[in-house]
Amino acid sequence: MKRLAYIDWMRGLACVLMFQTHCYDSWMSPEAKKSSSLIGWSRLGGTLPAPLFIFLAGVSFALVTEKLREKGIARNAIAKQTILRGAEIFGMGLLFRVQEFALGYPWSPWTDLLRVDVLNILGLSMVLMGVLCWATGEGVGAAARIRTLVAGIFAAVLVAMATPPLWTTYRPRFLPWPIESYINGVHIFKEPQPWLFPLFPWSAFAFAGLAARFFLFSDLARRREGLAFAALGGAGIAACYLSVLLDSSRVRLYAVYDYWHSNPDFLLMRCGILLIILFLVYAWCRWGLAQKGFSPVIQLGNTSLLVYWVHIEFVYGRFSILPKGQCSALKATAGLITIFLAMLGLSLARTTWKKWRVRALQKNPAATAAPAGS
């Protein structure tokens, strides 16, 4: 099995699901949305990309952290490197909002500059994971891994349990709305908005991904990797069942019960689905056809940030390739295929350029040494 192919495949899956959700939502007319069942299936698939991206950020964060630990790098240095990377992603999220505002001017409201989007929360989640891994990373070996695993689970549970009151009875109303929006996604509205990406509950997916990957670093998981992934898949099924069981219970922990948006039971269900997908994708990459020849899904996963950034403007923005809200299901599907092929071409161009640049630097090492000596 090629190293970490399952991660790129999952990212690529998130990209494909994101494309179809955005394309149908942006281009289909209201009449087409009412008359076609396609939009319902599209929206169902659209519930997965954001959790997948954030969960995989936790998985990748664990990989980077453990690799640095194994090299003997001090935990302060690891924390500095990973937290700065999180800050960089957060900065890119702010830059993305500036770009969207500029391209949408004069129709975009200035408040869109302060909207909490998925890149913002990805960056902040990475910062928080950096702090957590620093706190649990003293020493080396299994002890540090177990501490980080337990802390990741605890952090995910804490975020999930704190979400309902922070959305309802204990909202931090004393904060300015741009700050409160990072807590519960209230933005400029009277109530938190489920289409935004506040820390509560979205950062829980990152902590869940972190914990899942540190479980796979255990000695048993390294010896029996397939069995370990199957165990995660089984845990996912159990989590889904437990979520349904808790939802059907008469016991209510919170004054306001909203299963589909802020309740921990729903987050448990979504984490369970992510673990099931993780196992299925791993199995597909290891024993299936995922790596037989060229894989468009893996290719998109290699450049997920790039295609996320670029496709938005050609679907929702000023340069939309089809008229927004005016297309039939068939026409929107044709547009979706066009976006998919265009983003795949962009992804290939990006990776080809990177490979060419690496080869050029290897052939001319003096080019990389020159700046250091100048």
Short names for language-model regions:
Residues 1-374:
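Alpha-helical transmembrane segments and their immediate juxtamembrane cytosolic regions
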